[in-house]
C-alpha cells in the first residue's frame, strides 16, 4: 500500500490522560508519529492536537474513527499535505565567533530568510519558519560553523477548505 503524509487534527477538552490514550492508538498499529503539537483552538477551553503520520488512507481513516471514540474528543479530521497550509519553526544556537569571523554565515542566514533573535558574547540564536526541508537544509548549512543546539517544532497547519469544525465548536461552546 502507498504511504502518504497525513495531518490529523483532534479537537478536545484539555484533560489528563488523553494524550496517552491517543498515542496508544498509534502504538497498537505500529505507526510512528512524525510530528505532534498542541495548542489552544479558536474556541476557549478547546484544544487542538496536530499529529503528522505516514500511512495509507484506509489506516488513517480507521485511526481517526478510533480517536473520535475517546471520551473528551470533540472531533477529529485528517487531511493530505495538498489540503493544508503548514509550517514548522526551528531555533539554531550557534557560536558567536562564527557570526563575526565568518562572512559566509551571514549570507546563509540572509539567503534562508531566517532571523537572528538574540546575540550574546558566547552564542547567537537564529529562528527559521518554513517546511521541514527548509529548516533541515539550514541546520546542515550551519553545522560547520559551530551549531551548539537545534530544535524544531511540530507541524502547525490550517486547512485550505472550510472545515465543519467551526459549527461543531460553537455548538460545544454553547452547551458548556
Locations of regions flagged by a protein language model:
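Long, contiguous binding/interaction regions
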Residues: 1-47, 52-176
Amino acid at each position: 500500500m502507498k504511504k502518504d503524509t497525513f495531518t490529523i487534527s483532534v479537537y478536545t477538552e484539555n484533560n489528563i490522560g488523553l494524550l496517552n490514550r491517543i498515542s496508544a492508538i498509534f502504538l497498537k498499529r505500529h505507526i510512528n508519529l512524525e510530528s505532534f503539537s498542541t495548542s489552544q483552538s479558536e474556541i476557549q477551553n478547546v484544544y487542538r492536537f496536530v499529529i503528522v503520520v505516514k500511512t495509507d488512507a484506509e489506516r488513517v481513516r480507521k485511526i481517526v474513527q478510533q480517536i473520535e471514540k475517546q471520551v473528551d474528543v470533540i472531533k477529529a479530521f485528517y487531511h493530505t499535505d495538498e489540503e493544508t497550509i503548514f509550517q514548522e519553526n526551528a531555533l539554531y544556537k550557534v557560536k558567536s565567533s562564527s557570526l563575526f569571523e565568518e562572512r559566509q554565515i551571514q549570507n546563509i542566514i540572509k539567503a534562508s530568510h531566517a532571523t537572528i533573535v538574540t546575540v550574546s558574547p558566547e552564542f547567537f540564536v537564529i529562528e527559521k519558519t518554513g517546511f521541514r526541508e527548509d529548516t533541515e537544509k539550514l541546520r546542515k548549512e550551519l553545522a560547520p560553523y559551530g551549531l551548539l543546539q537545534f530544535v524544531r517544532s511540530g507541524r502547525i497547519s490550517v486547512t485550505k477548505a472550510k472545515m465543519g469544525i467551526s459549527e461543531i465548536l460553537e455548538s460545544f461552546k454553547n452547551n458548556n
